[in-house]
Amino acid sequence: MTMLRVRSRDGLERVSVDGPHITVSQLKTLIQDQLQIPIHNQTLSTNRNLLLAKSPSDFLAFTDMADPNLRISSLNLAHGSMVYLAYEGERTIRGGPAVTPAGSFGRKMTVEDLIARQMRVGRQEKAHCDSVSFDRDCANAFQHFVNESLAFAVKRGGFMYGNVSEDGQVEVNFIYEPPQQGMEDNLILMRDSEEEKRVDAIALGLGMRRVGFIFNQTVTQDKKEYTLSNVEVLLAAQLHAESELKEWVTAVVKLEINEDGGADVHFEPFQMSDMCVRLFKEGWFETEIGPEDDPKLSKLKKEVVVGVKDVKEVDNDFFLVLVKILDHQGPLSCTFPIENRNTQTTMRALKTHMERARSLPFVKRISDFHLLLFVAQFLDVSSDVPALAECVRLQSHVPEGYELLIDSMANTS
């Protein structure tokens, strides 16, 4: 007897099959018999992204198991393999476990029990963010570093800054990379409050704000069966909750093997669901994660309801809401050395940058967030920094005092 693991919006379940010689049609019949999901409602795939599909029309994109006569052995499915299942409608569970009575004639219910029973975790169908568009230069600078310099061996992250339109479209125009320690399976931000004040002052002058967080996954994670790990969910939920911005975007950069055996870099933007952010704010997540914990499951301190079950572990995919991705050419360049990387930025770098762009108007030469952040160390954060950034936003004449200061800094190298 062969056992297949079936993951759906209700969590992880098991289906017993006669062996890998059965067809997709026979597998669907077994799922109907054992999990009570009608055959005509089922969509099966070996692609975990099926669980992120929002509507039946989205299910149509997953065709690897669409042929009812296909033998599952041809999909390399064997004992213990994972199959992803999406279905329409509700399901009826028969033969459920015995229930311990609660209330007046059974176990005494606490306030926490009542709250937990009301805390139902389901898939959020629609994001607050309609789409996210990345400035090509800043996105390329980030992915190039994690690909070429870090080889996707350790994690790297950055805060995304830009604008949010009235209809929920997010535009990312620069990425600030805070001090951090990246490891194979974790990312520790060593945030510098003074530096972040300068970043926010620049954003203010540019008419922008913090709109999200971006990080890469490492190559060792590519073999795991999750979209975000439990550690990544915790960090994403923390930063989303801190932002108080409902359109806040979490973007993941990953390396994936293409059909030709080569590697492609992919950007995947999400929003953490409202329920995920609420659970984090209210302290439901277990924050101590051990090496024996399953990375695709988030542990909670109390039970919540997922589908028809009371659970203390939730599939991370339940907390993710897909966001459409676009790109654009923003108003800033991205050629100045980026902060907090392997080498410290020096006055020599400023001189090289200014000389290389000497044919351009002065305001164009300084229209780079990373240059502005470097210069901001020597300016008043409450007045000079936003004033200089505003010149960049308006592409207006830069006051002579700022121009002289920047030129003198460059000439000290």
Swiss-Prot record:
The modification Phosphoserine is found at S104. Keywords: Phosphoprotein, Ubl conjugation pathway. It comes from the Eukaryota. The keyword Phosphoprotein applies. May be part of a complex that binds ubiquitinated proteins and that is necessary for the export of misfolded proteins from the ER to the cytoplasm, where they are degraded by the proteasome. This is NPL4-like protein 1. InterPro entries: MPN, Npl4, NPL4_C, Npl4_Ub-like_dom, Ubiquitin-like_domsf. The keyword Signal does not apply. Pathway: Protein degradation; proteasomal ubiquitin-dependent pathway. Residues 131-272 form the MPN domain. Belongs to the NPL4 family. GO terms for biological process: proteasome-mediated ubiquitin-dependent protein catabolic process.
